[in-house]
Amino acid sequence: MRPDFRKRLLASTLLLGMGTPALAQTATPAPTEVPADPAAPADGDTIVVTGSRLGGLQLDQAAPIAVVSAQDFALSGQTNVENVLKDLPQLVPSTTGASNNPGGGVATANLRGLGSTRTLVLVDNRRYVAYDSNQVVDLNTIPAGLIERVDIVSGGRSAVYGSDAIAGVINFVMKKDFSGVQANANYRINEAGDGGNFNGNILLGGNFEDGRGNATIYFDYTKRNGILQSARDYSKQAQVDDGDGGLIAGGSGSIEGTRFAIGGVNRKFGTDGSYSAYNSATDAYNYAPSNYLQVPQERFLMSAQTHYEVSDALTVYAEGQFINNRVKNQLAPTPFTGSVAIDVDSSFLSASSQSLLRGLDPDGDGYVTSTIYRRLTEVGNRVSSNDNSAYRAVLGAKGDIGGGWNYDAYYSYSRTKSIETQSGNVSRSRVLQALRTTYDANGNLVCSDTSNGCVPLNIYGAGNISAAAAAFITIPVQNVSTISEQVASASISNRNLFDLGAGPVGIVFGTEYRREHGNYSPDFALSSGDVVGFNGGEGLGGGYNVKEAYTELAVPLLADLPFIKKLEVNGAYRYSYYSTAAKSVNTYSGGVVWSLISDLSLRGQYSRAVRAPTVSDLFSGASQDFPAATDPCTTAIARTNTNLNASCVANGVPASLIGTAYDGGSTQIQTINGGNPALREETSDTYTAGIVLQPRFLPGFTFTADYYKIKIANYISTVGTTNLIRACYGDADNGYTPYDSSYCSSLPRDANSYAITDATNTLANTGGVNTRGVDFEARYSLPLDFGAFGSTTSRLDLRVSGTRLIAFDYNPVAAIPDLTINCAGKFGQTCGNPYAKWRLSTRATYATGPVTVSVLYRHLSAVKDDDSATVYAVEKIKAYDYFDLTAAFKIQDGFTWSVGVNNIFNKQPPVLGDNQQQANTYPSTYDPYGRAFFVSTNVEF
């Protein structure tokens, strides 16, 4: 029979002190009336922390593990998982609720800044439902109200969990064996009175058959209101650098009244069809106000689980989830840019404009060709409505088969279907059709081509497009994607195989089969390239499978000797066979824990991990573009530099043509982009070494510090046409010696013109990343012999967590060393989100009687722009500090009420110009909303 954990699990939901789950090896008894650690293991319990399938406690592991408790979620006042995790020192913000462009309505986790595809997200040690063909988990789909704790393990764990665990693993451990009813309601609103966010959830559970079985069901509803950039002073106007160290109002040259350029002169049309000079400083279109600063969201989530102990040898279990998540992204109206034929006699034009245009019509055909720049505001904002539905089912069995051996086998299936409906797009072909006008027999202005019900389009002045014309050029778009995953897994384990005198040896054997499949069907209008508004996309369809076998071993070698209180080694190995080009893959790890005395332990680990290419990496459809690039064999130096001259000849350019404009003087090269079925796996080597202090002279105190180093090779990325050319032909820095001549095959030449054509810029195993740093955490739980509110005692809990980033070296093309950039302490066009060298999170919680008060302090160190060649108006973002305050009141047994303030001092985000991400700042890193308040209620019975 399983022990009844009901009391411990119920306690974990109450805001009565700072939870430290799986922290200490032994639980310290709490004084009367002071809440003990709600998630500390009961006597004889084993906490199965992430990083090992053999169980154990957090501080006994060779790999560093950070733990976030359910109480941390409650104290934060946040309703989405993303908003709690993004403030952890180990994570660099990724896609969040502040991500409008790009967005997609999802929230992802990004350990170490290595990318969400290199962070493996698990739920109860099993893979969870992905949201797209990149096989990334949307954190919105994880039920926050069911979370008991979150384990975050740094570094490669592929030997234990398989592909994707390069940066590490985030494992959400859910409540189990719950009996009773628990309901929560939370409402959060900004001081500005906007961005209201409501979450309500209820958990019902009960035991049956005298405790042999348990069943729970959970419902969760979230509604988040959107906030436009117009609602904040710093984001309501697009900002750009003024070239003199300051910021000025910026915008787009595609304006409401139409800008047109003929003969190098820019003019604009007024509402009456007249023209005037265009002034970018005053006439540029401010696209900022229409964009979301917080995207609206509505989510419904249901989860159910049950298990039944048939006998000691057989417990059957099942679980299922259904999630529907609806999120909108919004951009300013579509900008139309293109060369069009303007009817010089159009009645939409004033007499002065007609006269001007006739003078610019040398062939007298009645049309003038001009490049126009028009913001189609009459069509409305561009809106992407994402409706994501996902479900997951797990069916399994586990039990004791004697001799200390246990087994666990399960099958899981998950599927996500995403429907994206776009509005505000326009058809390029219909715009051109509606601009080509003539007069009918009655003297009415009509389309020259009247097919499809064409309506003449009056772009000559703001607000002049009629409703009928706007309807004619508008094109509805709907994209559909699906991603599915099947996992069949079985393992046997023995935590007491034999004893070498220092403790029981544990071992696990397992096998796993996994199949991934994805499909993306873009609207024909998008894939055909006719849409102007949102980016086009190519279809995707494909899948792969992997068969795996693994083992894990933990061996205590020595114990209770001088300076060897405990010495344990562990190892893991996994063999994987992919149906893709990756084929056979081996991953492995080894670690050691050496406790010199009870107070002091040293630990270290090495791991080889992999990230297999995703469905998207492998099967994304091909697309074509024309990036700016120059064929080096057409340059004058190709005639005089012997290295470059030889490379040109070797790649098919006749010696007589080298240094001439045989390509017509083109400054663009046709390039093919897309997925690559020949991709192999990324590999990483992770080293960690750390110290654990638990001094007996200071009960309740623990300190850990761990150094980590992660090196990724065969990094999957695109090279870029310019870098393809540099790799093949070299550059001035190396005397035009090829860096890697294998890249020359990606630059084929036309057999007749010898020009580079169809350069292949598909995904490749080409880059590399090296990062290293130190994680540290200190916790202190201090019982006090005084109290308040009717209590004679109290407790003070302190926690300081931090990361010192030493280096983050990224190179998109490992063959070209000078492309390497160290992103530690930087942000910008290459590094993206700020990589602060110091990230700290400190929480102090005081609990006495029915009252708990908690303060959270968050720190981000200063960062500098990563582009040394450009001087921006904002070259440095100063250090940022945030403070949050929460108070919880236990009104009576089973009823707790909480209130809180986030960003107490109303710290505003940094305002940037040309080197911003979006909304004139980095909204996923720095709080874009200002001071916010929340209130929550927890009821249990």
Feature roles, as predicted:
Residues K711-A713, I806-D809, Y857-D866, A888-F941:
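C-terminal beta-signal and adjacent terminal beta-strands/loops
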Residues T421, R428-S429, S607, S620, ...:
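C-terminal beta-signal and terminal closure region of outer-membrane beta-barrel proteins
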Residues P41, D177-G180, G193, E209-R212, ...:
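Short loop/turn motifs that connect adjacent beta-strands in outer-membrane beta-barrel proteins
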Residues M1-Q78, N83-D87, N201, G205, ...:
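N-terminal Sec signal peptide and the immediately downstream disordered periplasmic leader
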Residues G104, S133, N225-I227, D233-V240, ...:
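Surface-exposed, low-complexity loop segments enriched in small/polar and acidic residues
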Residues V34-P38, V48-P102, N110, Y128-S133, ...:
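N-terminal plug
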Residues A130-S133, G145-E148, A159-I170, K176-K236, ...:
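Outer-membrane beta-barrel translocator/receptor signature
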Residues T108-S154, Q182-A185, V508, L526:
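Periplasmic plug
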